C-alpha cells in the first residue's frame, strides 16, 4: 500500500496532540506519514531553554509515531504572525500537495 497521510500543524505539538493516535495507526497500516509544522515557535521558548527545543521535541515525538526523520518538516514562520505570511504559507501548502500527493490531509 503506497498511501500518504499529510499532517499540517500550525505549531510543533499541535499535530501530535490533535491526531497522534491516527498518525500512529496509519503508519502501522503501511501508510507514509508526512508531518509539517509551520512554526517551531522559537520566539515563545523560555530564555533558560535551548531555542530549538520545540524543533527537537517534535522530531522525537513524530519518530515515536512512526514518521521518518525526512518526513518531519518544520518551517520557520514566526508564531503569531501567520496572517502576514499568508501567501507564503499557501505557496508552501501547494508545494507540499504537489510533492507528496497525499491521500488524506489532517
Model-identified regions with their sequence ranges:
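Active-site beta-strand->loop->alpha-helix modules in alpha/beta enzyme cores, enriched
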Residues: 1-106
Amino acid at each position: 500500500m503506497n498511501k500518504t497521510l499529510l499532517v499540517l500543524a500550525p505549531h510543533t505539538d499541535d499535530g501530535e496532540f490533535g491526531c497522534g493516535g491516527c498518525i500512529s495507526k496509519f503508519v502501522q497500516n503501511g501508510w507514509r506519514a508526512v508531518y509539517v509544522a509551520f512554526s517551531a515557535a522559537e520566539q515563545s521558548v523560555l530564555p533558560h531553554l535551548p531555542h530549538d527545543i520545540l524543533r527537537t521535541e517534535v522530531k522525537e515525538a513524530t519518530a515515536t509515531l512512526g514518521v521518518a526523520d525526512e518526513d518531519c518538516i518544520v518551517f520557520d514562520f514566526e508564531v503569531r504572525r501567520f496572517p502576514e505570511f499568508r501567501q507564503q504559507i499557501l505557496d508552501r501548502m501547494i508545494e507540499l500537495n504537489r510533492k507528496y500527493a497525499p491521500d488524506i490531509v489532517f
